[in-house]
Amino acid sequence: GDEETRMADTVSGPDQPQGTIGIIGLGIMGGAMAANLVRGGWRVIGYDIDATAREAARHRGVEVVDGPAALAVATSDIILSLPSGEAAIASAETIAAAAPSRAVVLEMSTLSLEDKHAVARALASHGHIALDCPLSGTGAQAQSKDLVVYASGHGPDIERLAPLFLGLGRRYFNLGDYGNATKMKFVANLLVAIHNVASAEAMVLGMKAGLAPQQIVEVIAAGAGTSRVFELRAPLMAENRYEPASMRSSIWQKDMAVIGAFAAQLGCPTPLFSASDAIYRAGLARGLGAQDTASVCAVLEDMAGIRR
């Protein structure tokens, strides 16, 4: 039948109240999105290189296949939620070669613009479409469907996939040209990086002054100085509990490096971002890579001579 009709049917076919979506990368973010989509009535076909992640997804009702090629044959709309540009580009190349008809790949990882464009080129060479759709939110927010999707690329596909975005998040923005969403994500992450260290600095000042950590959280969250980041991270700081991580410091450091390079390339000064970067680096040097990014609080406590 007509290709456009077939694509429309995948979103609201008679058998599927919601349609079919493929997900490559079933880790903290991908696994949570898959679970929410299954709950929302989507048929989710997934793959992850890690056997544990595959098994967890299978338990959540995801149909697990044995690789990106098999996934590309099974569905034409595919999410990539992967830890590196290399993994995303390799998956895009496999999908491009294996997909029997026009595929739409939603690149939802936070990657450099160079990597995002490499993904798009790999797909375009075989007549497929890439959408640049990074997410705003942590792993915990992914679980509670509290994500915001920044979407950019081919407009008609973004509009067609609106139900998908609202099946895994609470809101989405169509930001126009491919790559714009990643630029916006860098702007958002710059603020998250600064707010997280600022939250820790405030907690440490309060604790050093003898205030109760839980009380600092409660009072500051009710006032003008609060932020979404403070509300998510300060409770972890108060409890001095940084595992399991909803955003690992080691992965966050990669995101930080990408933003730093992006700002430098534009010749844009980022004095507060640069200052906060040093605190994250100190955390990694102390071996806190596997811990949540809120662990910058432990670094500042150490510097302040606070023992808990």
Predicted regions and their residues:
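NAD(P)-dependent dehydrogenase/reductase Rossmann-like domain
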Residues: D9, A285-R308
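NAD(P)+-binding Rossmann beta1-loop-alpha1 motif at the extreme N-terminus of oxidoreductases
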Residues: E4-S81, A103, G139
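Rossmann-fold dinucleotide-binding core
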Residues: I21, L111-N189
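Interdomain hinge/lid region at the active-site interface
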Residues: T182, L191, R228-G289
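Rossmann-fold NAD(P) dinucleotide-binding segment
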Residues: P68-S81, G85-I129
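Active-site-proximal catalytic alpha-helix in oxidoreductases
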Residues: S144-S152, F173, Y178-A209, V219-L232, ...
